[in-house]
């Protein structure tokens, strides 16, 4: 899993940038744009929340954002893709899986589930209790995020193809 940012591209030798720009930049850019643009608004809200972008970004197309916004977005997608990988889940209970998440990843999961700070601030081991009223929403959100990031492009890029040439 790789993220291409403008900073990484600028550090590459000029000849390498030209080759990547000529052969790889367009398909990588298109894959990243398609992946984000085809998300439902709720999924975009989750990714934008994790990237600490505003709600209005969830209604924008990927190509409409500026360099900084796109970079924050692809970095957030990459982090969430690593966190919500089905390979990480193998053999782990929901409780164990959630306990492996960082605080920011767990907060994003709770937000995606439509839960509030009140639920987030409760001990997450409560999901093992049948009386936990928010556990089903959390488990549903967990399955949704596994599904969302299962087919994310291998290489995400925030760099427009023409930026390789400058």
UniProtKB/Swiss-Prot annotation:
<comment type="function">
    <text>Required for lagging strand synthesis. Might interact with the host dnaB protein.</text>
</comment>
<dbReference type="GO" id="GO:0006260">
    <property type="term" value="P:DNA replication"/>
</dbReference>
<keyword id="KW-0237">DNA synthesis</keyword>
<protein>
    <recommendedName>
        <fullName>Replication gene B protein</fullName>
    </recommendedName>
</protein>
<keyword id="KW-0235">DNA replication</keyword>
<dbReference type="GO" id="GO:0071897">
    <property type="term" value="P:DNA biosynthetic process"/>
</dbReference>
<keyword id="KW-0244">Early protein</keyword>
């Amino acid at each position: 899993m790789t993220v291409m940012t403008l900073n990484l591209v600028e550090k590459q030798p000029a000849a390498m940038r030209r080759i990547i720009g000529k052969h790889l930049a367009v398909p990588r850019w298109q894959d990243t744009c398609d992946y984000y643009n085809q998300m439902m608004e709720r999924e975009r809200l989750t990714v934008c929340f994790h990237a600490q972008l505003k709600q209005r970004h969830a209604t924008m197309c990927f190509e409409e954002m500026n360099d900084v916004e796109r970079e924050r977005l692809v970095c957030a997608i990459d982090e969430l893709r690593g966190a919500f990988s089905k390979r990480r889940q193998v053999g782990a209970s929901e409780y164990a899986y959630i306990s492996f998440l960082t605080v920011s990843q767990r907060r994003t999961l709770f937000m995606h589930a439509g839960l509030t700070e009140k639920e987030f601030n409760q001990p997450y081991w409560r999901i093992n209790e049948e009386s936990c009223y928010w556990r089903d929403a959390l488990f549903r959100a967990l399955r949704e995020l596994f599904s969302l990031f299962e087919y994310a492009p291998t290489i995400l890029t925030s760099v427009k193809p023409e930026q390789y040439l400058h």
